[in-house]
Every structure is written in structure tokens, then in C-alpha cells.
Amino acid sequence: MGSKTLPAPVPIHPSLQLTNYSFLQAVNGLPTVPSDHLPNLYGFSALHAVHLHQWTLGYPAMHLPRSSFSKVPGAVSSLVDARFQLPAFPWFPHVIQPKPEITAGGSGPAALKTKPRFDFANLALAATQEDPSKLGRGEGPGSPAGGLGALLDVTKLSPEKKPTRGRLPSKTKKEFVCKFCGRHFTKSYNLLIHERTHTDERPYTCDICHKAFRRQDHLRDHRYIHSKEKPFKCQECGKGFCQSRTLAVHKTLHSQVKELKTSKIKC
């Protein structure tokens, strides 16, 4: 009975264009090579089919024992070169060029450790604990990965320590302290006017009556007394006032009179 070969697998991803699929079909049609010529290469087309299927699905490469594929007789290699060109990807990259993976405990495939699956049931516990695999590899604060982890720890800060989003930290307001009584002011002008109450300094003097004032706006309001024009007039009685605050007090008198009249009418 002749040797049976596995059929070529059909790719499950139609969008992926496999240029080596025709190459696999051509390899399946190669004549059977005696086992004494290929002592360590068993089922060439079958192994290649499995490898291509894993390469198509994106699975990790199989760890197969090192074979003597590089010692294939010239008859087979000449047959392969005559019929088609070599594929774009290596036939057995994990065999021809093994990737050295050395861990802290040893070297070789025996020292490889698979990462455990993430447990969503213990999500809060996993977020607070350190990863033992990272500690074994020496990812401390001095390493690049440790520095990145230190930057990511900013997200674990308490709400009091987190920087405000969208707002810059408020500047400290300047305080002006009175040297006489120790009262605080946020503006230097207010402190200047306040200190004049202690020193009784009145730099603004009326030209007509020579009355002095601590503030310039007070002198301005005083000058309306000497002039016939009163800038603030009552709309009900027509009486004029030099200051707006005296007009506001005058309006309260009119409102009180109106309330008394309405209360008498109800009675």
C-alpha cells in the first residue's frame, strides 16, 4: 500500500491572500522519497500542512525536534527548484532559526513559563497586587518597564491628590496687612485708605469751603453741594441728591409711606 498524505487545509480566512497555498498543493504531489534518504523527516507534506494551518490561524509555532531538513538530498531540492520558487515564508522557522528564550531560572524550552489567564472574578484583587512574573524579571523602578508603571500609578491617586482637570491651580492672593491694627486687605488701595483712618490724613480738599476728605470720590460728591446741579434726582418728588446712596435711602421713605397708606385703606 502506498503512503497516504493529508489533504491540504483550506484557509478559514478568505480575506487573507495566501500566495503559498499553491506551493503546498505542489508539495503534496511530490513523489514518495525512501525513508533511508530522509531519516529524520517524517511526513514532509503532512508536517508542512500542519505548520501552514497554524501559520494561517496565528497560533504559536510548534516546538519540534531539530530535523536534518538542511541535509535533504539534491534530487528533492532540484525537483523543488525546477517546479516552483521558494515560498515567501520559511518552511520551519522555529526549527531552522530557533529563538532563544532564557528565563531567570534556567534556559531552553524547559524554563518557558506560560502566563496565567486573567481572572475576571478577582478583578479588584488583581488590580491591587503585584505581578509575580514581573518581579521575577526584575522590573523595578529603575528599569524602563518600572518607570512606565510609575507613570501609570498616577491613576491610582486619591481624589485629593489628583490634579484638577481643565483648571489651573489657583494663585495665592496677595495680602496687605495694616501696620497699625493688623487688618488684612487684598488690594493695596484699600489698605492705603484704611491707614488714613489711623493717621487722619485728608489729602483731598474742597476749593470752596476747604473741607478735606480722605478719598477723592468723597470730594467729588461734596462739590455737588456747592453747585446748583444735583445729579441724582428722585422720580416721585423731584428732589436732588449729590450721592446715589442718599437717593436710595430717600426712596425707602417713599416706599414706607405707600405701605402705611395701603394698610390704612384695608382697615
UniProtKB/Swiss-Prot annotation:
Role, per record: Transcription factor that plays a role in the regulation of embryonic heart and urogenital development.
Gene3D superfamilies tied to this protein: Classic Zinc Finger
Gene Ontology CC annotations of this record: nucleus
Subcellular location: Nucleus
Gene from which the chain derives: OSR1
Domain of life: Eukaryota
Keyword field: Metal-binding, Methylation, Nucleus, Repeat, Transcription, Transcription regulation, Zinc, Zinc-finger
InterPro entries: C2H2-ZF_Transcription_Reg (IPR050717), Znf_C2H2_sf (IPR036236), Znf_C2H2_type (IPR013087)
GO MF terms held by the record: DNA-binding transcription factor activity, RNA polymerase II-specific; RNA polymerase II transcription regulatory region sequence-specific DNA binding; zinc ion binding
Ranges of compositional bias, category Gly residues: 138-149
Residues with the Asymmetric dimethylarginine modification: 117
Identification of the protein by name: Protein odd-skipped-related 1
Record bears the keyword Transcription: yes
Organism, as annotated: Bos taurus (Bovine)
PROSITE patterns referenced in this protein's UniProt entry, alphabetically: ZINC_FINGER_C2H2_1, ZINC_FINGER_C2H2_2
Family classification: Belongs to the Odd C2H2-type zinc-finger protein family.
Zinc finger (C2H2-type) residue numbers: 176-198, 204-226, 232-254
GO biological process: cell proliferation involved in kidney development; cellular response to retinoic acid; chondrocyte differentiation; embryonic digit morphogenesis; embryonic forelimb morphogenesis; embryonic hindlimb morphogenesis; embryonic skeletal limb joint morphogenesis; gonad development
SUPFAM superfamilies membership: beta-beta-alpha zinc fingers (SSF57667)
Short name of any one Pfam family annotated for the protein: zf-C2H2
